[in-house]
């Protein structure tokens, strides 16, 4: 027996189903994008993903070198195609406060191949340069 659509139980069930769906989407995006970066030997491969336990799509791609890329759905208030975008940012050591690569967006619904191509072309060149600077600065401080 299904709960009536307006009851607290029904709302909770819808919320949990939507949360499960977002988590599965994030896992699929992370898994396929990590595989794509590894297939393309980006930074020699070794990328893996983690899904953040939050109520929106949030994936962290991590590399053994310490590099990381976060893909986060930040625009749930947006309408139309703008609502179907993920913001991609490079990760840096927490104590680093220098220049950072400019974030970019990719379509949630685009293929992993398309996402990887866009990230490699638009974000990675500046991220690699600024990440090396951050690591150099971090090593000097230690």
Predicted regions and their residues:
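Intrinsically disordered, low-complexity regulatory segments enriched in Ser/Thr/Pro
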Residues: 1-11, 44-118
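Glycine-rich and polybasic anion-binding loops at the starts of cofactor/ligand-binding domains
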Residues: 127
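Negatively charged, low-complexity tracts enriched in Asp/Glu with abundant Ser/Thr
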Residues: 2-63, 130-142
């Amino acid at each position: 027996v299904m709960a009536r659509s307006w009851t607290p139980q029904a709302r909770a069930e819808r919320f949990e189903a939507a949360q499960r769906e977002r988590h599965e989407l994030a896992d699929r995006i992370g898994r396929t994008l990590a595989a794509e970066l590894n297939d393309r030997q980006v930074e020699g491969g070794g990328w893996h993903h983690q899904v953040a336990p939050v109520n929106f799509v949030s994936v962290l791609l991590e590399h053994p070198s310490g590099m990381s890329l976060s893909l986060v759905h930040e625009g749930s208030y947006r309408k139309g195609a703008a609502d179907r975008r993920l913001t991609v940012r490079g990760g840096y050591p927490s104590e680093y406060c220098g220049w950072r690569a400019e974030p970019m967006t990719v379509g949630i619904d685009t293929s992993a191949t398309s996402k990887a191509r866009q990230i490699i072309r638009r974000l990675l060149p500046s991220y690699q340069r600024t990440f090396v600077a951050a690591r150099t600065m971090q090593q000097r401080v230690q």
